[in-house]
Amino acid sequence: MLKKKGFSTSFPNEDFIDNQDTISNFKIKKEDFLLDFDDTYEQLNMTTPKGKIIIQGQENHSPFSLKSFSNLSFDYNRPLSPKTHILNIQDNNNNNYSPILKRVNKTISPSLVSSTNRFKNSLSCSSSSPSSSSSSSSSSPRLISTPPIISTPSSPMILTSSLDKFDEILSENEFMSLDNSVTSSSSSPSSSSCSSPIVIKTNATTSTKIVTPSSSPSSSYIEDAPSTPSPSKLFQSLSFKSPCSSPSSSSSSTTTPKSSINGGNIIKKQLFSNKRIQDIKIEKPSTKIDLHPSKLQIKSNLKIKPSLPYNSTEVTANTKTTTSTTTTTNTTIPTLSKNIIKRTSSVGLSPTLSSTQLVNKSSRKSISAATTTTITPHNNNSTMTTKTPSKRSLDTSNLSTPKSTSSTINKAFTTSTTPLKKPRMSMTPLSSSSSSSTTPSKFINPLPSSSSKTTTTITNSKRLSTLSKPSPITPITPTITKTTATTTTTTTTTPNKPTNKRLSTLVNTAQKPRKSYAPPPSSHISDELEQRIQEALLAEANGNYTGGSVLTHSSPQKVEQSEWSPIRKKSTLHDVHACTKKNY
């Protein structure tokens, strides 16, 4: 008996029946009787009750099925599979053609090769003639009655317009090529403007085609065939095409070819060897430019209303820009997520001069602006005036106190402090003097004699370990030209009442009466239910089990029903006795 690992086989033939030893030693295994839904994916390809191996859902009906593929006779007339055709295109294999072409294994006879050499020599001799002979012969076309040229399969150009002669040409292995003839005829310097046309006559075709190798765009030309021709490419190479004749020709084919030095036809090079890939329409980019909303220009009036918690503030930034006719301003809002706020305050005889720096490490230039800010904490309003960034605005500003804080003294008294953990970025400078916190409300308008000065430089950094998150809303710092004055006003407001978040999202907060999904309280339904319960209790006490027991949920009536009719659930006691008597 044939035994293999994992399964047992049984063959119902005569040799197996005659051998009694194998029948006595035959054992039935559990795997032989597995159903289809009992098999796992690993057991599916192992065994079947028939004793045949299943590979990918197909049975091997013969032991030589794996070897029988090499014994198949391949018919070249049938279409090749798409996979082999694609592989031939990728590898540039010239041996396999498309389904239309027949593969010819004939060897080229030496007489045909000699005829091709004679044809090339005649063309080269005629092209090397002086300009007088070529100009005189340009009026009448030359007739060449030589046999057709046999070319390599790399350029199978076929000069015939009749499709019925196509099979005959292919069977005789007559492939025409115009590459050598056109380039050799136009190689003379006298034929730079227009060379004499060539008329080629073949025995297979009845019609003749005239090829004029001139550089004009209206002249007919033949596209270069790919190394692996597809059917559409072969049918296209049968007839001559002019660039303006086909309406479906792309814009690249209708362009006038550049006149070469020799003045001959320019052979069209193809991007892809497959014609179907070449037929794909190249879509031109549309003139409409779709921009992301983040890249659009920012309008002058910005109203930022983020979703803030109760203790935070709403910031409305109004930018008023006055520019000349030639200059423009690019206002950008830098995001302050994951930044470091460096506060340096200098303590001296003059009022506090503090600076807030946000370090921005990027490839672009950092945006900086010198701002003069006065803060009134009573009204929670801050007015900020932006000036052009210069050192004069810091040093030569008019102060009510003497200028005892120069740039060198500021560096000596500079103390760096980290801001407190607040939900928003506090604009009050952190310093030892309390001059800015006790400013009266008359300093709302920005004056040159303001009591506090804040220099803000916006930059980026990555160290955030001990610092709190800054507010995502900052005043706009524009990039200003010399003839531009930009004023940014920041107004901070706090909500009046501590409102509930959940109530603010509701449209209508009025209390509606709740719908009761219970049935309406009716007296007769409840009375009927109680009456049924009492009747059932009385019937069970009296021993009449007509409707089933309420307390024990079992009755002899149901036991008798299950003995003779499990389908009929409801029946009287008389029907039960009648049916049981008939069964006896």
From Swiss-Prot:
Biased composition, class Low complexity, residue ranges: 237-260, 366-376, 425-479
Which residue stretches does the UniProt record annotate as biased composition, category Polar residues? 377-388, 395-419
- Its domain of life reads Eukaryota
Note down the stretches annotated as region Disordered: 123-156, 209-264, 355-479
Name of the protein in question: Putative uncharacterized protein DDB_G0268590
